């Protein structure tokens, strides 16, 4: 038999659905009070039939009168939620049917008894002790079921473990009401023993409603991220002891004899250690031991008594308890503890400027609350929560157990001098601290922390003057940053009150008097409010090496007590000697690199927050530490690995990638500030190679950005403050001591910085330097090797120091690359060796500003990059843009004239061509030019000319107004813009040769900015090394003669010309080089540019004498007696065919000045050697319509195009030799579709011109299908026109003896078959090539016809065809319409280099079309008969014309 109560048994089987009044009444015999009586049982079919055993504890009957008492009348909010728990009024038959209702013994007979074990026994069956009470702490990772199943026994009885909202005042009894109604019997006469409250609590087992608790807390947590709610009055903040106990561990020890006391905590409480369904919060768990002698009192005695009494009163609402409870008189006990608010009132302590904002999210901070950990005053230790993942970097106070007498002696020696600020804990990001020159450290950066070893000797004397003597606490609280969003944190005063003696660790005795406790608390409060007298901004820390190991294991950083009170800075320097950490300001390159890293990390942090990574909510790149990101990475790695096993990888992999990127960036940041930019770049380069498959592109962009910063640093050398400080320190040591031996420990792997350090140290007079390296076979240095040297300074790498290193032989140790928690700091202190470290910090300007990369350029516009660009002479007309580029963006411009091809399309004064790199150009076009006629045509033609030199072209249309924010777009301007856009659309759809983009800028300032952005974009997207791209030290401002020769090529821009001369051995070698050689020498130059260049150079024979001269061309000698006409070897065409046949090389020779009336052209037989410079222009100069020399022939006059944009200026004495280059790479002509109507001299009618338009794609497509079989180098595709140049055949010369054309051996000789005859016979000059030879045409050749010219075609000169390999049979795809667009002209007396062609016979079906091929105006030659021969080496029987 167990001692239990009726109430306990009734509660165990009392359910709503088993109400007895719902059952019908029948008679049955039951035993009640040892007597058999007939009882009316329930007729409910669900009821039990068998007679149950009557309780052995029932000795008397009860008269039951049920009166419904509703608790919901006072809590209307619970009515709607509990409608299902109500009993229908029809079923309540208390009065009318009470005679028929079963008695209490009948009800008790239904009960089943269960044995309950002793509540004072633990799970091992042993009685709880006080020691077990104080060390009970449960993990957050335990599930709710574990807490329910575990039998936790507490001395203090928790009757109300239901969740209490912070907003509900504890004075409201309704918050403690249960949610369903009780049937309260008015007269119960118990005659049994009253069970204890512990037993009642154990049997009732009230469980808090965890589900609602979690939901509300999650909502509260979400709201807390944006706008945290405040409360009405801080003085009304009260916490239930049961709530606090439930939050932390669900079973904290309390003595039953004393009421539960609540006090406003002075130390953090772990609100994160709550039962939440959020999985990520489980990582916040930390277990802390509780003091065995301390008692958690969170309220004053008075408040605790009130709450205790109120809970008893509320429990009386539970009707079954009323008869069993005795009246407990309220006893006024003396107060043993006071809240902070009461103590402030008692001691009249007021905080200055403590203005409490009800809407502020940091109300708990200003109230002195810090809800991180629950401890009492006697044992106040604050730690970083979330398993070392807290981003909190505020100054945290460490209060250790101290004896009363010691504290009183400390208080007697209060300092009255200007004290020194003390920091007690290492900062989580000490390397990001601000310099000492900050005017108000506590005001500007309240979260600044330094390490224990930190000591500042710079600027101490300057900052001894008090500034801002009294700094309000709320200012510091408002500016506090980087608190974890799920931690309620409190920032203490920025400057702690000092003490003159070291507070040693001790433990409090349990039996302390009440007065001593009160005095201790008052003294502590006074200490906390001494910040008002502290004025110095110099911060000094000192670490206590004898710290508590147990506490150190639970914290991220070492903790040190408060030290050094009433001593000046000089005295501290003398006592500490050189045992300090000197802060060094970061260099410009380090600041720039940090800004780039921060700009790259900002979007990553945002993405992590959006991916619900809770620890990163308040992280900032400047404050997050290595251990935090490493833990996050390991956590995400485990999540991903678990997801892989389950086969569900959604966004977890993306979260893992972001965590890895953030960790890498933080690591690079630490390496950057610890060592140097070079070391950080080396680490980043290795990481980029290792993680190339996952993070390669992203890390590649960051690597390029840091490479650019490194280049800027090389161009603008900066001061190394760290080496300067080291040099000054060594000189001061040498002056103070006669013999010193300094050990310098380095961590950097960069050889450049190491060599620079050694170079500076070697310059110090009287200092002998030794650099120690480890043996290849051994990892560490031997002690003998270190002692063998006699130098006064030893430099050794960190990793080479072993266990037997002779530390005692050194009088001073310098850690050149300081890191947090350095092992050498503690080691030197243990050995009592003077120690100094150099720590790099960032200025406040870098930490405060937010840096974002330019979206277009991909770089920071604040960082000036030393660009060097080429610009045309039109830039002189825009001095505003020139000044902005040079002053605001550090862009230097070198002037070069426009190419001859550009000068054909309007004056160069209204536009500027800026060469960004070998691929990119910018055209600065004034919008005013678009008001003129033919403006769009000129712009498009300029693009056509630039397409030979560049692959990307940006057109910036700007207005010259400086502050113009609007566009002055007239009707003509809009019309031309529409035409330009239409042409650009065709470019973008049909061309891979030129990518054109058009931008309209509102003014010169926006124009200069766009140029900088385009330059950044080109630099970031280039595949070249940033150093190579930016280095333009080899450029020459003044153009050389060789450069001018190269600029005559229409495909060479000024940058490529100087690049060729800089890399090439000589100009002669460049002109003779093949395409493969040029591509190997100039990989950065576009391939099409080199192809065009080789296509031109392969046409000429360049002798050895032309090294310093322009290349010369050997042309055939002409004999007027034998030759009256000589056709051009280069098969030139008019400009219309040039534009359409953009992929072929044509040379347009100047026309004769006059045309004979008899329709014969008198040719000049004078031949001369042409210079390359004379044939540079691929298009003739622009002339007006009235400057054209009209042909006297009526057929010519009628066919001259009237709508052509430009005409040819015919000169007699100085012909213009214009060359157009091969455009072999383009799959479709960029300019052909929109520019076919532009021709120099239109011979055909407009209908024929339309026909030529349709021919263009066929010409382009046919070129793709043509290939060459060559032993030598192939530098050009086969073209469609009959007389276009094919291959790179060497020039031919005239043999007077044999009266034939002969080919000379040349390096560019190209053979089209297995064998070729060394001498290619040509037609005799006396013979007529195409008259009356129709019978000789072969049926194999087809597609090569010339239109019969009755009255329309005008042939001024006969195009002779030497080495007439017209087409192979497979290549004869041209038709007669295609040849209608080809016209051939010859410069009298001169011809260009010849190229070999395939020989093919004409189709007999095209006989008639050849009759008009000979111009009737030419002298008739002697007719010769055509003969055929087989091509040597051909197996397919291919034939060719045989020449006599």
From Swiss-Prot:
Q: Name one GO molecular function term.
A: ATP hydrolysis activity
Give the UniProt subcellular location, in the record's own words.
Chromosome
**Highest taxon listed in the record's lineage:** Eukaryota
InterPro entries, per database record? SHOC1
Example GO biological process: resolution of meiotic recombination intermediates
Q: Give the EC number(s) listed in the UniProt record.
A: 3.6.-.-
Q: Specify one Pfam family.
A: DUF5587
Q: Which UniProt keywords apply?
A: Chromosome, Disease variant, DNA-binding, Hydrolase, Meiosis
Q: Carries keyword Hydrolase?
A: yes
Q: Where is this region: Disordered?
A: 1106-1129
Q: Which GO terms describe its cellular component?
A: chromosome; condensed nuclear chromosome
Composition bias (Low complexity) maps to 1106-1117
Q: Which disorder is it associated with?
A: Spermatogenic failure 75: An autosomal recessive disorder characterized by male infertility due to non-obstructive azoospermia resulting from maturation arrest at the spermatocyte stage.
Per the similarity annotation, which family is this? Belongs to the XPF family. Highly divergent.
Record's function text: ATPase required during meiosis for the formation of crossover recombination intermediates. Binds DNA: preferentially binds to single-stranded DNA and DNA branched structures. Does not show nuclease activity in vitro, but shows ATPase activity, which is stimulated by the presence of single-stranded DNA. Plays a key role in homologous recombination and crossing-over in meiotic prophase I in male and female germ cells. Required for proper synaptonemal complex assembly and homologous chromosome pairing. Requiref for recruitment TEX11 and MSH4 to recombination intermediates.
| Subunit text | Interacts with TEX11. Interacts with SPO16.
What name does this protein carry? Protein shortage in chiasmata 1 ortholog
Q: Which organism is it from?
A: Homo sapiens (Human)
Gene that specifies this protein = SHOC1
